[in-house]
Amino acid sequence: MPEPAKAAPKKGSKKAVTKTAGKGGKKRKRTRKESYAIYVYKVLKQVHPDTGISSKAMGIMNSFVNDIFERIAGEASRLAHYNKRSTITSREIQTAVRLLLPGELAKHAVSEGTKAVTKYTSSK
């Protein structure tokens, strides 16, 4: 009777693996490579449970998320600077999203962001 297949490790999972050096016997930690892969994978499974993603596509999605993050953070930073504020709040993030994303996409992003902030503050 065939055994059930073990679940494949989540794509993008990061583990600090220790490697033993050749003659010295010293252990060296592998550097951690941070990525949004596990989160992209979770969202993919929520939207399309039967669909997979290639490592190349995952790399593109990771680059996309990093790019959008940097754009929003940069715009929020400028907004805070223009208004002589030293703190980036959810208001700056929301305004940055409205400035960067087009039309309907901005509306959906703002509503999802507001929902996430509300959920976070209510859980405290």
From Swiss-Prot:
Residues linked to a glycan: 111
Domain of life where this protein originates: Eukaryota
The keyword Transmembrane is annotated on this UniProt entry: no
Residue positions where N6-acetyllysine is found in the record: 6, 11, 14, 19
Function, as annotated: Core component of nucleosome. Nucleosomes wrap and compact DNA into chromatin, limiting DNA accessibility to the cellular machineries which require DNA as a template. Histones thereby play a central role in transcription regulation, DNA repair, DNA replication and chromosomal stability. DNA accessibility is regulated via a complex set of post-translational modifications of histones, also called histone code, and nucleosome remodeling.
Family annotation (PANTHER family): HISTONE H2B
Official protein name in the record: Histone H2B 1/2
Compartment annotation: Nucleus; Chromosome
Modification after translation, per record: Monoubiquitination of Lys-119 by the BRE1 gives a specific tag for epigenetic transcriptional activation and is also prerequisite for histone H3 'Lys-4' and 'Lys-79' methylation.
InterPro entries with a match to the protein in the record: Histone-fold (IPR009072), Histone_H2A/H2B/H3 (IPR007125), Histone_H2B (IPR000558), HISTONE_H2B_site (IPR055333)
Broad class of where this protein is predominantly found: nucleus
Stated family: Belongs to the histone H2B family.
Gene Ontology MF: a single term: structural constituent of chromatin
Phosphoserine found at: 13
Cross-link (Glycyl lysine isopeptide (Lys-Gly) (interchain with G-Cter in ubiquitin)): 119
UniProt KW RNA-binding keyword: no
